Amino acid sequence: MDRGGYRGGRGDGRGRGGGGDRGRGYSGRGDGRGRGGDGDRGYSGRGDGHGRGGGGDRGRGYSGRGDGRGRGGGGDRGRGYSGRGDGHGRGGGGDRGRGYSGRGRGFVQDRDGGWVNPGQSSGGHVRGRGTQLQQPPPQEVPPSSSQAQVSQGVAPGDVGQGGVGDVGRDGVGDVGRDGVGDVGQGGVGDVGQVGVGDVGQGGVGDVGQGGVGDVGRDGVGDVGRDGVGDVGRGGVGDRGQSQSGLSSGHFGRGTQLQQPQPQAVSQSSSQGQVSQSFATGGVGLGAWARKPQLFSDSTVLPSSSSSNVVASHTASGSQVMTPKPSSSDKKEPVKRPDKGGNIKVKGVINLSVNHFRVSFSTESVIRHYDVDIKGENSSKKISRFELAMVKEKLFKDNNDFPNAMTAYDGQKNIFSAVELPTGSFKVDFSETEEIMRGRSYTFIIKQVKELKLLDLQAYIDGRSTFIPRDVLQGMDVVMKEHPSKRMITVGKRFFSTRLEIDFGYGVGAAKGFHHTLKPTVQGLSLCLNSSLLAFRKAISVIEYLKLYFGWRNIRQFKNCRPDDVVQELIGLKVTVDHRKTKQKFIIMGLSKDDTKDIKFDFIDHAGNQPPRKISIVEYFKEKYGRDIDHKDIPCLNLGKKGRENFVPMEFCNLVEGQIFPKEKLYRDSAAWLKELSLVTPQQRLENINKMIKSSDGPRGGDIIGNFGLRVDPNMTTVEGRVLEAPTLKLTDRRGNPIHEKLMSESNQWNLTTKGVTKGSIIKHWAVLDFTASESLKKKMPGYFVNKLIERCKGLGMQMEAPIVCKTSSMETLYDGNALEELLRSVIDEASHNHGGACPTLVLCAMTGKHDGYKTLKWIAETKLGLVTQCFLTISAIKGETVSDQYLANLALKINAKVGGTNVELVDNIFSFFKKEDKVMFIGADVNHPAAHDNMSPSIVAVVGTLNWPEANRYAARVKAQSHRKEEIQGFGETCWELIEAHSQAPEKRPNKIVIFRDGVSDGQFDMVLNVELQNVKDVFAKVGYNPQITVIVAQKRHQTRFFPATTSKDGRAKGNVPSGTVVDTTIIHPFEYDFYLCSQHGAIGTSKPTHYYVLSDEIGFNSNQIQKLIFDLCFTFTRCTKPVALVPPVSYADKAASRGRVYYEASLMKKNSKQSRGASSSSASVASSSSSVTMEDKEIFKVHAGIENFMFFV
């Protein structure tokens, strides 16, 4: 099948007959109310029910005969119809969908847009785009409804692409781009391509491109591709860019649902009612065939600003025929094949895990309400601060809204333990209420649905495979209600208002926590982890400036550049103390003049004084009785939208909870913050236990108890199995292979007396010394090169003396043209003096980190095909000598970059592969721009192994795609490039591929399975290549941590879990295939396990095999002599994507080279530049053919 399409065949029910390309074309015969069709969104053949007969081009043209109430038709570009329509539909034809010819025994539209009636009809009206319609007169819709109602005039099983009984893609009254009885692009109850909670191929509240309360590809109230109410990569959590509440139905990953019986939907819904005329009809791809809408006397329709309002009677529940769900090709994550691993292990250890079990009654119900708050000026966006103030006032003034029984997400959703009044409420603030003085708002609240906790328990028990994200979202908001009122909220984290650590320049750090809800084997778990973040102090602006700039007094302002002050203050929030108000203002800048020199035109609106010029000093004295002490400095501009509002600095105070970016921390403070964050496992354990019991924490207050939730204050305990380390293949000093059996708890090996598996031959190489003009302490010593050669030889490499040695200065790195010229001179000299030789390697000595490093890498690797190895003299030189460990690490990188291998597994076919198998490992990652960068592209990197069975050499492909797009575009083509690099002959292609995907959350699994993996399969299928593929996601950004319950063997205090600790019980998913593996040895801080999730497994690994495979691969990372935390295909993909970011920033620096010479612009400022490199410039990321299959990126 091609992207979910169906080819040929017969559809015997209300589903589909046919096939086609991209899942929307159908051929053959559909004998129910489905479709007959063929082509790309086009249809041919015969449809014998209420569906369509048809065919044509681009999926909206139809030919042939439609014998039901569907269409007969055909034509060009899907909007013209020819032939005969025998029902209430259309006979017609023409070009581009606006003219119709032929005969239809019902209402038929002729070419000119008029209506003719060649036969009897029980139907109503059908309209085409751009034609005149005859419609029943509009009737009044109740004020509480914001949606259109569907006309009674449209016949059952209405033609068009819309309606219940619809054969299109959408929901009630809407299919494709149409509405009720509408063949145009808009209609009643129509929102673009959206149906009732259904978008694209989704169902009610499904994850298509949007739904009721859904924006993106995800679940309830979600924006992006993630989980419940989450915008980034998270699960249940934050609301992001937009959210319109929850829609009806269960939420999964866009697959078929087992639908409950129809239920009544409240008449107070903001949606329109469904016409009685829509009681019957068939369903093709759309709403009911996937996720039936629940309704009885009325139902909800999506909002549409373009809909015409037409009233009608409503259909009774008995008239609604819910068809059987259609089959779906959508893949779901594979289920766990066994009860977990039981492989031979070093031992079993008892662990505490920072998961706290949440108990609840399955009889409990959480009521979900949609909130819409409107101000007097409907076009003005209402801030979250205003939303909170309005909600609080209404709940305070109206006893029917109990605060203690509700949780508010700060935007559109309220969850309640009791029933709340619905409707429209006026909220007026009096003139004495300073912040919101005299403002009026309308608070509209409507019940969306009742969230049954029984649905969540059914999922946890495995009785349902569709995660109720709406229930999880409601519970998550409830859990966060109490801490959000008492702590500083930063995304999904909560921090104390007290800064416990003082960095000394107006900045300190506060402790906090992050928590998420996770369905697990043991039930619902609250995962709680400690956190630390730097904030500006909530002090006066003048005091802050004195601390930040190190001034003894404010008079030193004159010695500072105003731009430096503006750069630090702009965008910060302040309150003022010259009047009684809690209102927050944003600093927009400084006044050009000092306070004493600012005058303005004063107009007394009460008419007591004539207009006059007045100074700021006089005004504050007269108006507020306040003298200004610091008149010789500028005022702050707190105005907005071009209106200046100057306020003396001494009256302004910084609002608490304003983050200080860690990249702006002084070096000592940054190191201190990092050190504080890297707490020992014992310290982290104690911090978390304090937080779970804190009155400010997630268990604090009465709110969760009022919803019937209880959080166990004790951590979950589990058993961890410690896997045995693999035996490694190294060499002795003579180059003979040896087997290294690792016995230590850390699983590290030592190369002091041993060598790498395959040492490279480096005969022609060069040295570029950028430290030649530096002081003696920073300069590369003359002995360094000889020491490096000696260490490389000790590891089994054959390295001769360099054939080219050139000196330069760090200043050269500022000039891209000069740098390229220098590198070309190295190539020319080597070629000229050594018989056309090209340097295998260029060693570059630098004094410290420099943006010119990016330019050097970009030029060398994309333009010239040079492998470079940079090093910092300040790191390499310790006293009068160079560190042997540093030289060894440098040598390992060099060996890998030029084609050698550093370590190999003895059991490199992992015993569970067959001897005839050819296996390839692929890793994929997407590198996104910094948070403040709204322009730069995301960088994709895909890496793949080049050798089997060693599987320790990789090639990488790097490219750019749309800003912050996580879905890898052209994933199949990129993987195919790597397949070709792996094996030139078809018979040598791998028959088994394991793809490791990094950087995706649970809510993006659908994207990986049904978009990225499908794209790979489609590309492979075109060349007749059909390997077995297993897809595994590696998740790093989670909060789960393990704490050993006993001391280690050597008797030291409680530390990290041993390398190889795996957990695949209790805290994992109830039935899907995941586990936690802590492969690394944690020497600093608390080890973070990697969460591995098997999404698809055609190879058929059991738990023992997949755990051993991943753990063993972690020993093959080329840069170190210990197992790494993340499986190498993912680690390499991450490094290659970072290298792509380096290329992009180097290209921007070149484009922005008009900036003052010597100013080292940060990548952030460059990336935000208006002169952003276009996405079409693919050459930026195209690695030179000479090195693209080498590991240049390590």
From Swiss-Prot:
Residues 540-656 form the PAZ domain. Residues 181-214, 229-238 have a biased composition (Gly residues). GO terms for cellular component: ribonucleoprotein complex. Pfam families: ArgoL1 (PF08699), ArgoL2 (PF16488), ArgoN (PF16486), PAZ (PF02170), Piwi (PF02171). Coiled coil: none annotated. Keywords: Plant defense, Repressor, Ribonucleoprotein, RNA-binding, RNA-mediated gene silencing, Transcription, Transcription regulation, Translation regulation. Residues 841-1145 form the Piwi domain. Gene3D superfamilies: 3.40.50.2300, paz domain (2.170.260.10), Ribonuclease H-like superfamily/Ribonuclease H (3.30.420.10). GO terms for molecular function: RNA binding. Disulfide bonds: none annotated. Residues 142-158, 256-277, 299-316 have a biased composition (Low complexity). Residues 1-98, 167-180, 215-228, 327-341 have a biased composition (Basic and acidic residues). Residues 1-277, 299-341 are annotated as: Disordered. Belongs to the argonaute family. Ago subfamily. Involved in RNA-mediated post-transcriptional gene silencing (PTGS). Main component of the RNA-induced silencing complex (RISC) that binds to a short guide RNA such as a microRNA (miRNA) or small interfering RNA (siRNA). RISC uses the mature miRNA or siRNA as a guide for slicer-directed cleavage of homologous mRNAs to repress gene expression. PANTHER family: EUKARYOTIC TRANSLATION INITIATION FACTOR 2C. This is Protein argonaute 3.
